[in-house]
């Protein structure tokens, strides 16, 4: 397999530990273990009681019954048996795409967005057409272009809701039209939902609640602020779940007892996490809006209830070298937009802890003005 390096992961692997002010990450301000244990109102007693009686064996190979039940509650019409635990959203995407794509098949993928959604099918031998989204449309997809791209042999349509790094959300009415287009050629639809909107969730519907040949991927990493658990999932119909069961034996076997117990506990306490994270989204988005209003060299399309965003930078320098200079000179970390095929900008992880965001933005402004004005 000839597979490309994931641009954003490569950049973060190389540079994130050098950062003093990390405003590049897409997770909503990661929880500490102490904060996680306080979620149950009993100092973590419910987690400790469950974990302390578990043997440190392989555990439930495809996720415990409790984990599957908690995930199924996130959807309207999901059989818990068709929930499969994966190694984060990354493992979920890998297994889902491998279960659908074959050499020579045709795939349509939203672009630009999270790179594995279009590069993985290509690495597996598919012919991939990019369904390009445009800034002038507020990063919303053009359905007429999707209709032109699908073919009788289209096997899969890949979308990202919300988009990483753009923060654009696909509402239910648009997703329903995507489903109708997929049905017209009997294609699967994979929707990476790790950034599923926390704000106004009634305006969006998971692909698995709209389409039998829909598969969603998700994890506790982004909306639930616990990426350390490395616990994600796929939800699909039984046909695809059975294919992924076979693949899991090659790619992971299991997520591990500790991760399963922790993820189950997090999902059981999701209401408290969502309340916390909605407050972070709203507070920090307003901080960035106010900063943007006074910063002539930056602009953005505000994200809608999700933790990831992209900002344009009006600077006489390519974004890659600028972000490296910024990091080395000030300690502020941004991901260059070119790592997402979005040059002249950067991914802004605006859901960092508030004090980090405020200092990071102030430092960024001072640096740009000193360097260019």
What is each of the regions a protein language model found here?
Residues 1-88, 95, 268-269, 371-373:
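N-terminal small-domain helix-loop-helix segment of the aminotransferase-like
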Residues 77, 316, 325-334, 340-373:
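PLP-dependent enzyme catalytic core of the Aspartate aminotransferase-like
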Residues 81, 99-121:
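Conserved PLP-anchoring active-site segment centered on the Schiff-base-forming lysine
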Residues 124, 184-185, 295, 330, ...:
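Helix C-cap/helix->beta junction micro-motif
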Residues 135-202:
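Active-site phosphate-binding strand-loop segment of PLP-dependent enzymes
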Residues 210-243:
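Active-site PLP attachment segment
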Residues 244-251, 266-289:
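Structural signature of PLP-dependent enzymes
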Residues 264, 280-289, 299-313:
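Conserved glycine-rich beta-strand-loop-beta hairpin in the small C-terminal domain of fold type I
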């Amino acid at each position: 397999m000839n597979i490309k390096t994931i641009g954003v992961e490569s950049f973060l692997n190389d540079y994130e530990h050098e950062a003093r002010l990390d405003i590049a990450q897409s997770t909503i301000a990661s929880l500490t273990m102490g904060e996680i244990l306080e979620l149950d109102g009993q100092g973590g007693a419910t987690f400790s009681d469950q974990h302390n009686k578990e043997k440190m064996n392989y555990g439930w190979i495809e996720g415990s019954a409790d984990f599957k039940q908690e995930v199924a509650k996130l959807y309207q019409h999901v059989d818990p048996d068709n929930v499969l635990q994966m190694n984060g959203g990354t493992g979920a995407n890998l297994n889902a795409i491998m279960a659908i794509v074959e050499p020579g098949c045709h795939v349509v993928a939203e672009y630009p967005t999270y790179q594995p959604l279009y590069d993985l099918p290509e690495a597996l031998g598919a012919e991939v057409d990019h369904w390009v989204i445009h800034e002038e449309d507020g990063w919303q997809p053009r359905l007429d272009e999707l209709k032109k791209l699908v073919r009788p042999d289209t096997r899969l349509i890949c979308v990202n809701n919300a988009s990483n790094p753009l923060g654009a959300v696909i509402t239910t009415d648009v997703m329903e039209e995507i489903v109708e287009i997929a049905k017209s050629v009997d294609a699967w639809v994979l929707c990476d939902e790790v950034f599923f909107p926390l704000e106004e969730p009634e305006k969006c519907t998971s692909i698995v609640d709209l389409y039998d040949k829909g598969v969603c991927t998700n994890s506790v990493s982004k909306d639930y602020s616990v990426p350390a658990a490395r616990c994600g999932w796929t939800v699909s119909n039984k046909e695809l779940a059975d294919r992924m069961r076979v693949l899991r034996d090659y790619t992971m076997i299991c997520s591990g007892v500790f991760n399963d117990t922790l993820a189950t506990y997090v999902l059981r306490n999701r209401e408290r996490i969502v309340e916390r994270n909605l407050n972070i989204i709203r507070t920090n988005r307003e901080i960035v809006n106010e900063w943007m209003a006074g910063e002539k060299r930056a602009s953005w399309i505000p994200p809608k209830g999700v933790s990831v965003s992209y900002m344009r930078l009006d600077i006489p320098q390519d974004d890659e070298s600028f972000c490296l200079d910024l990091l080395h000179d000030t300690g502020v970390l941004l991901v260059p937009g070119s790592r997402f095929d979005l040059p002249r900008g950067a991914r802004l992880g605006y859901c960092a802890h508030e004090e980090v965001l405020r200092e990071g933005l102030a430092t960024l402004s001072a640096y740009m003005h000193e360097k260019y004005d």
